[in-house]
């Protein structure tokens, strides 16, 4: 009886000791998956910024810091305000109500604005748009030949919103700012690959085959919700605040190309 009890306790003890190890392994695997989904660039996607014959303009999306007045008004709103154009307007405004303005009341309509963007889903399409095809015919050849990427024509790749919306440029800026905060890849709604851009990587084309090297521009796909509202400046004596009325939400999506990057796909065909 004592022997059975000892065996049982030993099994329980071993199980308890192993259990945390299993949990740790699962947590590590989860972290690995998260790392893979964040800027995990496949080996067939290459940075062509140094080789690109067209100098793309780097338009860094920086957060516009509100000044003291703008910050005070933004914090007074019950609806989050992140639109950089609206913040810029507040920064350029001045408001100094008199401290002696007892009983004074007023409201100023500032317009109908997209106020913030909430991202629900973000995914990468490494073959968003084909930009070039290089072909090497070795059907009659007797030796292996090599093929490499050379951009034959200038290619302009544009992204954009997936549906119409009010103040589309403001919405694009908010979406790009939100997307850029979660990736180190250079995002831009437009990128250009210049003619003559090339990479040194070679692809072998054996005899009696035709080699096809396809090049694509990658892009990030964003899906989320934009919050709109009518913004009023409320003045009451020496106090001031922003009030947002008639709040609406709209589902929106966007494609944002990855600047100065190309994805490659190589195929061999025999005829």
What are these regions (language model features)?
Residues 79, 93-96, 136-149, 270-271:
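Exposed regions on extracellular, virion, or secretory-pathway luminal proteins
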Residues 1-6, 15-118, 122:
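An N-terminally focused, membrane-permeabilizing/fusogenic/translocator signature enriched
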Residues 75-86, 127-136, 142, 185:
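Short low-complexity stretches enriched in small and charged residues
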Residues 143-201, 229, 238-271:
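Membrane-insertion modules used to breach or fuse lipid bilayers
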Residues 113, 117-152:
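A glycine-rich, hydrophobic loop/mini-helix early in the fold
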Residues 190-231:
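Amphipathic, membrane-active segments
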């Amino acid at each position: 009886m004592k022997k059975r009890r000892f065996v049982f306790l030993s099994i329980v003890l071993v199980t308890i000791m192993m259990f945390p190890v299993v949990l740790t392994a699962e947590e590590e695997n989860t972290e690995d998956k998260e790392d893979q989904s964040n800027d995990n660039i496949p080996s067939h996607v290459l940075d062509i910024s140094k080789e690109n014959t067209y100098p793309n303009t780097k338009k860094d999306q920086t957060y516009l810091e509100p000044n003291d007045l703008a910050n005070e008004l933004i914090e007074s709103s019950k609806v989050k305000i992140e639109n950089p154009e609206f913040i810029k307007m507040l920064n350029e405004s001045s408001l100094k109500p008199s401290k002696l303005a007892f009983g004074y009341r007023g409201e100023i309509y500032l317009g109908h604005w997209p106020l913030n963007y909430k991202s629900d889903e973000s995914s990468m399409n490494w073959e968003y748009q084909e930009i070039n095809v290089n072909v090497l015919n070795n059907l009659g050849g007797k030796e292996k030949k090599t093929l490499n990427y050379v951009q034959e024509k200038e290619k302009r790749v544009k992204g954009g919103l997936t549906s119409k919306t009010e103040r589309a440029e403001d919405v694009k800026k908010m979406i790009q700012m939100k997307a850029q905060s979660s990736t180190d890849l250079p995002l831009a709604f437009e990128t250009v690959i210049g003619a003559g851009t090339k990479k040194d990587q070679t692809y072998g084309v054996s005899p009696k085959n035709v080699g096809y090297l396809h090049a694509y521009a990658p892009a990030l796909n964003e899906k989320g919700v934009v919050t709109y509202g009518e913004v009023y400046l409320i003045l009451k004596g020496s106090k001031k605040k922003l009030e947002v009325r008639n709040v609406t939400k709209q589902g929106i999506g966007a494609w944002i190309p990855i600047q100065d990057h190309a994805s490659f796909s190589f195929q061999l065909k025999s005829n």
